[in-house]
A protein has these predicted regions:
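Beta-strand-rich domains and repeat architectures in extracellular enzymes and scaffolds
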Residues: 8-43
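Cap/lid segment of the alpha/beta-hydrolase catalytic domain
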Residues: 335-456, 463-464, 497-506
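Structural motif
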Residues: 39-43, 84-90, 130-136, 176-181, ...
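Structured, non-catalytic alpha/beta "coupling" segments that mediate domain-domain communication
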Residues: 305-328, 491
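Beta-strand C-termini and the immediately following turn/loop, strongest in propeller blades
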Residues: 30-37, 56, 75-83, 115-116, ...
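Blade-terminus and WD-like Trp-Asp/Gly-His loop motifs, strongest in beta-propeller folds
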Residues: 21-29, 66-74, 112-120, 158-166, ...
Length: 620
């Protein structure tokens, strides 16, 4: 097998992360967001010559591009104040002046799209009540706004009809149960369109071009999600699209001529884009993307172009544009750091194993270049966040970094992961800290079957809820893993459930994990904090000081409890971070520190990347 050049954390993390798509009114430029500067800022790219231009220059707070304004003379964007997941809307004028158009430091603002005449846009904000989102119409010239819907319940905006007479909302009763509602703006009346018995997911509804029908995602009578069409005149609904796995979502082009769908393949974990011609009934996909997932498509106002992102294991997310007239597809960005040779990256393998009870668990396996069949490599069991998330194929610089340094990585889609059917998704209901964790323990048996993994040197690592799983493994399966790494994961599910952000849907969380009032004994029994006396193997915890999802106290208390019982723990706190690592300098430092921790505990030849004290605070 070929060997690979070894790279630093900085070289992997210097790959840009890009998102957001907005065409200029003349369709000659595209607005997008990139962290090429080290933090998210707004950029634009010219379609004719491929030139890029940075438009905002934030040094501390994330900025997300939204749209051009006023014939592309101004830019609409959102700013995350303090990186605490509270966003305000701002306008960037040609002079460089920024104007704030939504109030409040503890407010979330969500932009939904433009009116048919492009003179106004729609946005929801929770400034009146942090638990609820009111819908407004903003004038593009004056930024004056008019209330469209005042929320009395937790409804989520889906779509507004072209004539602005009706709005589609979704409402969840439980984690696996939701409905679509039609709101009559003039009558101020809300009507349920998808009344049903039992648990059925109905979500992501859109109007068709002339607003005579509603298309929405459902799993009614099916293990996977599909598209239904509801005729508003007759009330009849019919299935119009199914796939081998979930249809993730669907939407119409501004002219109504095309419908775009994204479909998840549970066998490859790749996401494909299907383009439906509403006039001819034909369906086609873009060629050249068989090994990559397509995401986040936007069709231009004229309907001539569709822009989208494509991402693969060895190809970070890049922006593409397809011309429906010429049938040419053009790549507009190159995100991978030029210092990294794509051939040195590792393509993941789709594998699976049978867990303790026989349930098949889908996984992704990264095997380092140069690993021999008789080798004894250390390994990481990589646990994704959620609960209800998943790990898919796609560029993951942090995983490639560890693989590049000799670690086999097995990404486990434990029971409860999204994308593998309704039955699999609901299999972790009120079972956190038990069955999903046991799936991760069973992953060691699969690693042993490979022949080239030293199962005495297997570490469990995860972020967010994956971090909780790592701590749970250290506490409840204390002899299974050589060490555990927790990145911003909760340790006390009782206090976490009591202090959820107000804008979260508590019912969905309680349904999946447990209600702190009714299920406190259950939550205590699966909270690592109350079982720290069992932790004997090395643990590393990394935490953002301003984390709104997993507050710092969750990690502070866990570290104190482990030390109180004599357990080994290393602790890093990042003073200018929230949930995860948004700033590149922090990501570089964090993953260097993790590698140092792994090497110190698993390898005889320690790579001294940076000093790694038992506890440290990392400042901006």
């Amino acid at each position: 097998m070929r060997s690979a050049k070894q790279y630093t954390s900085a070289q992997f993390m210097n790959t840009a992360r890009i998102s957001g798509i907005a065409f200029s009114p003349d369709e000659e430029k595209i607005l997008y967001t990139s962290d090429a500067s080290g933090i998210r800022n707004v950029y634009e790219v010219c379609l004719s010559d491929g030139r890029h231009r940075q438009l905002t220059y934030s040094l501390s707070e994330d900025i997300q591009s939204i749209s051009y304004l006023l014939n592309d003379r101004c830019i609409l964007f959102s700013k995350d104040l303090g990186n605490l997941e509270n966003s305000i809307l701002c306008v960037l004028e040609p002079t460089g002046k920024e104007i704030v158009i939504t109030p409040g430091a503890e407010v979330q603002t969500l932009v939904h799209g433009w009116s048919l005449d492009q003179r106004s846009f729609f946005a929801s904000t929770n400034e009146r009540d942090q638990r609820l989102y009111d819908l407004y119409k903003f004038e593009a010239l004056t930024f004056k706004r008019r209330l469209i819907y005042k929320a009395t319940e937790k409804f989520y905006f889906c779509s507004i009809s072209p004539d602005e007479k009706y709005v589609l909302f979704a409402k969840s009763d439980r984690k696996a149960d939701s409905d679509i509602f039609l709101y009559d703006v003039s009558r101020e009346e809300m009507k349920c369109l998808t009344a049903h018995d039992g648990d059925v997911l109905n979500c992501l509804a859109v109007f068709n071009g002339d607003a005579t029908a509603v298309y929405y995602i459902t799993n009614e009578g099916s293990d996977f999600r599909y598209v239904k069409r509801l005729d508003l005149a007759s009330g009849e609904s019919t299935c119009v699209e199914k796939a081998s796995g979930d249809v993730a979502w669907t939407f119409f082009s501004p002219d109504g001529r095309r419908r775009i769908s994204f479909c998840d393949d549970p066998y490859t974990t790749l996401r494909s884009m299907k383009i439906h011609d509403e006039e001819t009934g034909s369906v086609f996909t873009l060629s050249g993307f068989d090994d990559r997932s397509l995401n986040c498509a936007v069709v231009s106002r004229s309907g001539r172009h569709v822009a989208f992102y494509a991402e693969g294991d060895r190809s970070p997310g890049n922006l593409f544009v397809h011309d429906f007239e010429t049938r040419f597809t053009t790549q507009l960005t190159e995100s991978l750091n030029r210092d990294v040779d794509r051939q040195d990256l590792v393509e993941s393998q789709i594998v699976s194993f049978h867990s303790f009870d026989g349930l098949e668990i889908p996984c992704l396996l990264w095997r380092p270049h140069g690993t021999t069949e008789t080798g004894r490599a250390p390994a990481l069991v990589w646990v994704h966040g959620g609960p209800g998330g998943r790990l898919t194929k796609g560029y993951k610089g942090r995983i490639q970094y560890f693989v590049n340094h000799g670690y086999v990585v097995l990404g486990v889609n434990y029971r409860g992961s999204y994308g593998f059917g309704k039955t699999f998704y609901n299999a972790d209901h009120r079972k956190q800290g038990r069955e999903p964790l046991w799936d991760c323990v069973a992953a060691k048996n699969y690693l042993a079957s490979l022949g080239y993994v030293d199962t005495a040197r297997v570490v469990i690592i995860g972020a967010s809820f994956g971090g909780y799983m790592a701590l749970a493994a250290a506490a409840f399966c204390e002899n299974e893993f050589a060490a555990a790494v927790d990145i911003c994961g909760p340790s006390n599910l009782v206090s976490l459930a009591k202090k959820l952000p107000k804008y979260w849907d508590k019912k969905r969380f309680y349904d999946k994990i447990g209600d702190p009032q009714k299920d406190e004994e259950l939550l205590r029994s699966i909270s690592p904090l109350f079982h720290a006396d069992k932790i004997k193997r090395p643990v590393m915890i990394l935490q953002g000081a301003n984390d709104p999802r997993c507050p710092r106290e969750q990690s502070d208390e866990m570290v104190a409890a482990i030390r109180r019982h004599g357990g080994p723990v290393e602790y890093l706190v990042y003073e200018d971070e929230a949930h995860g690592f948004r700033k590149r300098k922090n990501a570089i430092h964090a993953y260097e520190a993790i590698l140092n921790f792994l090497d110190a505990n698993l390898k005889s030849n320690v790579i001294q990347v940076q000093s790694n004290p038992m506890e440290a605070t990392v400042s901006a």
